Amino acid sequence: MAKKSSVEKNKRRRKMVAQQAPKREALRAIARDRTLPPEERFQAVLKLAEMPRNGSKVRIRNRCELTGRPRAYYRKFRLSRVTLRELASTGQIPGMTKSSW
């Protein structure tokens, strides 16, 4: 089980990313637009640098929904490999069966 503080910190980051995403994307578009004057583009870069770091998408860590485990994460199920295996073996994931050949 992951530390509760780590899980909560990640939730706060997700919320902040959702709030900051439109403004951040607009500033990035201005900074990348080669048709604009360099001064305007540079100002957009400075404003982007002033924004909170936790508003950046790359700061989010994928974690298991049940345990909070940060590693061995399956995106499709939003679970870690350990939790996925436990739930699959007890038949709690619809359509998932143990393979045999």
Curated annotation (Swiss-Prot):
Database matches in InterPro entries: Ribosomal_uS14, Ribosomal_uS14_bac/plastid, Ribosomal_uS14_CS
MF annotations from Gene Ontology: rRNA binding; structural constituent of ribosome
Disordered: annotated span: 1-23
Keywords linked to the UniProt accession: Ribonucleoprotein, Ribosomal protein, RNA-binding, rRNA-binding
Recorded GO CC terms: cytoplasm; small ribosomal subunit
Gene3D superfamilies listed in its UniProt record: 1.10.287.1480
GO terms for biological process, alphabetical: translation
One Pfam family here: Ribosomal_S14
Coiled-coil residue spans: none
Family the UniProt entry places it in: Belongs to the universal ribosomal protein uS14 family.
HAMAP family linked: Ribosomal_uS14_1
Quaternary context: Part of the 30S ribosomal subunit. Contacts proteins S3 and S10.
Function: Binds 16S rRNA, required for the assembly of 30S particles and may also be responsible for determining the conformation of the 16S rRNA at the A site.
Full protein name: Small ribosomal subunit protein uS14
